[in-house]
Amino acid sequence: MTQEKRNLHKAPPDGGWGWMIVIGCFFVTVCTRAVTRCISIFFVEFQSYFAQDYARTAWIHSIVDCSTMLCAPIGSYVSNHFSCQVGIILGGVLASTGLVLSSFATSLEYLYLTLGVLTGLGFALCYSPAIAMVGKYFEKRKALAYGIAMSGSGIGTFILAPVVQLLIEQFSWRGALLILGGFVSNLCVCGALMRPITLKEDSLHYPLKQEQMENEPTQSGRLDSSCSPLCQDCSHKRLCYCTKKEYSFLLKPKFMVLAVSFLFLAYGCSPPFVYLVPYALNVGVSNQEAAFLMSILGIIDIVGNITFGWVTDTRFLKKHRYCCYLIAVGLDGLCCLFLPILTRFQLLVPFSVMFGYFDGAYVALIPVVTGDVVGTSSLSSALGVVFFLHAVPYLVSPPIAGWLVDTTGDYTAAFLLSGFSMIFCAVLLALAKIINRIKKRPKAVAVPTSDIKQEIWTNGDVSCANAINQKEV
């Protein structure tokens, strides 16, 4: 009881242990998103070893991303009903096990199950709960906190990309996966940092006090059989009410538009990460230079995370986060449209810089914009839904892009489709913003003509009109 009172806050503390939460979330994104990105470095190795085409090999990366996003609501459920610590530690065990088992793969189908499903499920149990915890600890500096936390994806990619390439060269792809499995087990340590916090806003959804529940202890969480049917019925209704309240944001028009836009965003953002290295190798870039492109993308991703988070926390831009987000998405899509004409390493470097910056910018704002729409109390559940919506696009976009590469013989169609998808996402959000602004304009109040008598005076040059309420005459 004392611990619960100590952890009950009227508002997010905006500091204190919150910075440890940011550090924990930072390493969660390193071990989940950065490792997922680095799986694309194994692409050529898998394709060569198993003698498969682009489309079949691309399913590995797709299934990892899809499993991570598809199972995100499970991560939110475990976080909401048990604790964030339990979810992340369990996820760390599953993800590490999946990577270790993948090192013994004998076929692509084996990798689909271990590297794809099992590792993806582990990442799902870690990712959304860790991100939601940052939102519970920060309000005024939320975008900056998220920028630092989400920069783990970029920093991790910058460091891990050349390291993974070196591990493959020294120990083969099997040894590299085994070492990555040990590295990902650090998610269990990150989970231990996630100290629970209860906000006053959250406690309003659970009106029964702890003392009231302690007076009548129950076994196994069940009501005693001597309880009246009315008591049991009230308990059931309260559970249903809490569940409905937890997901009431699904009916908000703003969230619906945001949800649809995520489908196009998720489709567009995945292929560039999967096919940047194979594309670079295809145009004559060396293995180390191709891996270095991913490192550049990763380090600039960090700059985008932190600078965009800091800038959008300023007084002037704080109320325009939504617009900053859609601009970043649109510019990221525009970068993809130019990628097919960049055929030298010197030209691919600027692409990695621009694409990485805007990718980091909008990724840092996804939980912020979502929180602005649904509120802090529903953020964990909302992020579960948001990442769930990423699942199908993440699953189908790399194989579709791979099919386009196999069919056309180059990467042009794949990158153009990716770019236009992200641009459409930005256009959709912009249209929704414009329509919402038009609806908010104050409407003129019509005055009944039956109660008004109009008198007009004129001097020949200027006419004056005066409305007199007949009821007062």
Curated annotation (Swiss-Prot):
Protein name from the UniProt record: Monocarboxylate transporter 12
GO-annotated biological processes: creatine transmembrane transport; creatinine metabolic process
Catalysed reactions, as listed in the record: creatine(in) = creatine(out); guanidinoacetate(in) = guanidinoacetate(out)
Family statement: Belongs to the major facilitator superfamily. Monocarboxylate porter (TC 2.A.1.13) family.
Topology Cytoplasmic: residue spans: 1-10, 436-473
Gene Ontology cellular-component annotations: basolateral plasma membrane; plasma membrane
Protein's job: Functions as a transporter for creatine and as well for its precursor guanidinoacetate. Transport of creatine and GAA is independent of resting membrane potential and extracellular Na(+), Cl(-), or pH. Contributes to the process of creatine biosynthesis and distribution.
PROSITE patterns (alphabetical): MFS
Membrane topology annotation: Multi-pass membrane protein
Entry's transmembrane regions: 11-31, 58-78, 86-106, 115-135, 148-168, 177-197, 257-277, 291-311, 322-342, 349-369, 385-405, 415-435
Compartment list: Cell membrane; Basolateral cell membrane
Chief site of localization: membrane
Lineage, highest ranks first: Eukaryota, Metazoa, Chordata, Craniata, Vertebrata
Lineage: superkingdom: Eukaryota
GO function term, MF aspect, one: uniporter activity
A Pfam match: MFS_1
UniProt keywords, alphabetically: Cell membrane, Membrane, Transmembrane, Transmembrane helix
Gene source species: Xenopus tropicalis
UniProt-listed CDD domains: MFS_MCT12
